[in-house]
């Protein structure tokens, strides 16, 4: 069992969060790399498509007579040297190049990325009240104070809350979005491995971490 410090909005330690040892089972670094590559590759549309000389709309009329003009002979306006002509060796969507990652691989990669953040001290746990009722109105100054009191490096911070449709975290979300140190605000049910890998520091609510542990640890039982 691993114990993580839990902080309130004043930046003081208010308790401990228990993580099962199964959360830190060894994983393959290659699986993390494959997962991150798949996320980035699947953001592409793979829809670039150009028309060759046989596909463009054009007249079959010869541009000018074969001899006597002094110009090089031409037989078709669809040739690539003409404006509106076909493209030579242009891109074509040859096949579906999306990379598929199954659920087990995805969850294993996310679990390993979170474990690395915890082991390097880049993840802190905040009380649920920090995300729900800590602010009566959006206050960027108070959000920045919270990060400093918790000794969070103000750089590339990702806030992770529980479920998107539960609780009222709008004030905190509006407070942190104006900070250059904050990378983003997301929810445990929507988080991706790329969000975790790209963030330098993570502030996660109790509820979000409970949901992540519940969904990720079960995959280690084969």
Swiss-Prot record:
Pfam families from the UniProt entry: Ribosomal_L4 (PF00573)
Disordered: annotated segments: 50-72
GO molecular function: rRNA binding; structural constituent of ribosome
Keywords, sorted A to Z: Ribonucleoprotein, Ribosomal protein, RNA-binding, rRNA-binding
UniProt keyword annotation of Ribosomal protein present: yes
This protein's record includes keyword Ribonucleoprotein: yes
Gene Ontology biological process terms in this record: translation
GO CC aspect terms: ribonucleoprotein complex; ribosome
Entry-linked InterPro entries: Ribosomal_uL4, Ribosomal_uL4-like, Ribosomal_uL4_dom_sf
SUPFAM superfamilies membership: Ribosomal protein L4
Function, in words: One of the primary rRNA binding proteins, this protein initially binds near the 5'-end of the 23S rRNA. It is important during the early stages of 50S assembly. It makes multiple contacts with different domains of the 23S rRNA in the assembled 50S subunit and ribosome. Forms part of the polypeptide exit tunnel.
Subunit details: Part of the 50S ribosomal subunit.
Entry similarity comment: Belongs to the universal ribosomal protein uL4 family.
Protein name stated in the entry: Large ribosomal subunit protein uL4
Taxonomic source organism: Chlamydia trachomatis serovar D (strain ATCC VR-885 / DSM 19411 / UW-3/Cx)
Gene this protein is translated from: rplD
């Amino acid at each position: 069992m691993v114990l993580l410090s839990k902080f309130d909005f004043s930046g003081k330690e208010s308790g401990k969060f228990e993580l099962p040892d199964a959360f830190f089972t060894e994983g393959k670094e290659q699986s993390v790399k494959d997962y991150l590559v798949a996320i980035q590759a699947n953001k592409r549309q793979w829809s670039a498509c150009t028309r060759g000389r046989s596909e463009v709309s054009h007249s079959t009329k010869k541009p000018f007579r074969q001899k006597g003009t002094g110009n090089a002979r031409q037989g078709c306006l669809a040739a690539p040297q003409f404006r509106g002509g076909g493209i030579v060796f242009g891109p074509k969507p040859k096949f579906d190049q999306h990379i598929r990652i199954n659920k087990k691989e995805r969850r294993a990669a996310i679990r390993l990325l979170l474990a690395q953040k915890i082991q390097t001290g880049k993840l802190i746990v905040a009380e649920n009240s920090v995300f729900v009722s800590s602010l009566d109105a959006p206050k960027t100054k108070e959000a920045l104070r919270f990060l400093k009191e918790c000794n969070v490096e103000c750089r590339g911070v990702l806030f992770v809350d529980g479920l998107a449709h539960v609780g009222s975290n709008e004030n905190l979300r509006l407070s942190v979005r104006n900070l250059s140190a904050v990378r983003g605000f997301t929810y445990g049910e929507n988080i991706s491995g790329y969000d975790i890998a790209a963030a330098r520091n993570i502030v996660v609510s109790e509820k979000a971490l409970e949901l992540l542990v519940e969904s990720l640890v079960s995959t280690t039982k084969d």
